[in-house]
């Protein structure tokens, strides 16, 4: 599994300065100042009440302001900043689970256009490194043989490559690898984490959620400051 940040929201502070004389610090990844994503959430919230003077010491800083937002559940201001990930070598099963999060946007490798005959399976965490991995890989190889044979048979009958693959892909297991680009705003990613960064979640998508959280700690640390370092439910609650 490979999860990498492909794009994040960049903040242009000039309009806020011109309109409200509001100064924001948005040097991304500088620990002494809020990141662009965190600064945007704060700026959006302050516009609601025009509270640009930072009179309340408890919410004068970006961590304090966003901490109060999180405590009150006013997550709408987190919808302005987005993070895009390049995700590789996850299973089709994970894609099925992740696509239930309606506010994410997906661009996924096509099983109709792209040949899958030489792919490697995504081994579930429970099987990875155990005596079950070898037969698991053998079963996947057999499925690929059936897939490849199906494509060739349909091609011999006059079907084009796309038509042959669209029929033969029904033979591909859930372990077939998927590459995709996934975009979500911070509120959407928090929703993913709340459901998938949990001991009761599917093991592979829980691993994915952990990778996402690691990146969000760099991109928007104050917007996920309440997220636990261990999956929800680890303490038995």
Swiss-Prot record:
Cofactor note (record): Binds 4 FAD per tetramer. Each FAD binding site is formed by three monomers.
Protein name as catalogued: Probable flavin-dependent thymidylate synthase
Gene encoding the protein: 16
Matches recorded under PROSITE patterns: THYX
UniProtKB keywords: FAD, Flavoprotein, Methyltransferase, NADP, Nucleotide biosynthesis, Transferase
Listed Gene3D superfamilies: 3.30.70.3180, 6.10.140.450
Organism lineage: Viruses, Duplodnaviria, Heunggongvirae, Uroviricota, Caudoviricetes
The enzyme's E.C. designation: 2.1.1.148
Homology family: Belongs to the thymidylate synthase ThyX family.
Top-level enzyme category: transferase
UniProt cofactor(s): FAD
Motif (ThyX motif): 100-110
Protein origin, superkingdom: Viruses
């Amino acid at each position: 599994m490979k999860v990498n940040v492909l794009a994040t929201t960049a903040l242009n502070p000039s309009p806020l300065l011109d309109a409200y004389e509001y100064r924001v610090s948005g040097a991304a990844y500088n620990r002494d100042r809020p990141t662009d994503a965190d600064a945007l959430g704060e700026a959006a919230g302050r516009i609601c009440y025009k509270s640009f003077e930072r009179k309340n010491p408890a919410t004068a800083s970006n961590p304090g302001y966003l901490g109060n937002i999180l405590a009150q559940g006013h997550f709408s201001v987190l919808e302005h900043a987005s993070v895009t990930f390049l995700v590789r070598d996850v299973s089709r099963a994970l894609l099925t689970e992740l696509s239930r999060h309606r506010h994410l946007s997906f661009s996924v490798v096509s099983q109709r256009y792209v040949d899958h005959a030489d792919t490697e399976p995504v081994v579930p965490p429970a099987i990875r490194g155990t005596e079950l991995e070898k037969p698991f890989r053998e079963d996947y190889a057999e499925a690929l043989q059936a897939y490849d044979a199906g494509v060739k048979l349909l091609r011999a009958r006059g079907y084009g490559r796309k038509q042959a693959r669209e029929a033969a892909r029904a033979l591909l297991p859930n372990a077939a690898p998927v590459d995709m680009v996934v975009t979500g705003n911070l509120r959407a990613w928090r929703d993913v984490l709340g459901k998938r960064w949990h001991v009761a979640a599917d093991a592979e998508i829980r691993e994915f959620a952990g990778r996402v959280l690691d990146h969000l700690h760099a991109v928007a640390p104050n917007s996920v400051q309440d997220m636990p370092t261990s999956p929800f439910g680890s303490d038995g609650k």
